Amino acid sequence: MQYKEVAGGICAPKGFAAAGVHCGIRANHSEKYDLALIKADVRCAAAGVYTTNKVCGAPIKVDRAHLTDGYAQAIVVNSGNANTCAANGVALAEECCELVGKALNIDAKDVLPSSTGVIGQPMVIDPFARGIPAAAAKLAADAQGSTDAATAIMTTDTHKKEYAIQFELGGKICTVGAIGKGSGMIAPNMATMLAFYTTDAAVSPALLEKALKTVVPGTYNQMSVDLDTSTNDTLIIMASGLAGNPEITEENADYDAFVAALTAI
């Protein structure tokens, strides 16, 4: 199967915009971007794969609850605080989803939160109350939007990570884009790694989840740096279906091609 590298990262597929802003989440008062927002024009088939650690971050608990129907429309990510082992963690993650829902005029249950950073630190809603509306106002469906979001999810990373490819499904050009973070503490089985995929391919929620779970063991779970498994490992994909290919609803040649494209990313 042939692929073409394209610019734009998570904003390369049709129907997606992204942003990154600084809102003051880090305890050291760093001016770095620390909040990313990814928004789809339509409700998307969505799936996630998470840490195997018995202790998981509050956002993962919320993600699992929000993904029971297999759909989502936005992802909100903060860096600098893991929102793990905090008494109010789940409530705060849900409140972040409410803020995103209000800012984007979508259902809060269609928002998937994610966090990375220091474990066990207090976390308050104030930075999110400032940052989420700012990120919503800054959303851009272009390469800069993807780059800003990729920058905002970094912690100890020395380089941002984003990529996108195009391929053909059912006679239509489809695109998959991704951003990720992970530098130190990314082992075994992903550990402190976040990755967010967008695609305009039409894939049913069930087959999207199956494809993601097929790809992860031979790709992300092979990474090893310092033998720690994080509480916050997260890989989420949203599929807008706007490429116009026949929806993948069974394991056929198009499904195999889609899995191959995810593996290539």
Regions found by a protein language model. Give the residues of each.
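A structural signal for small-residue-enriched, beta-sheet-centric alpha/beta enzyme cores
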Residues: 1-91, 95, 101-265
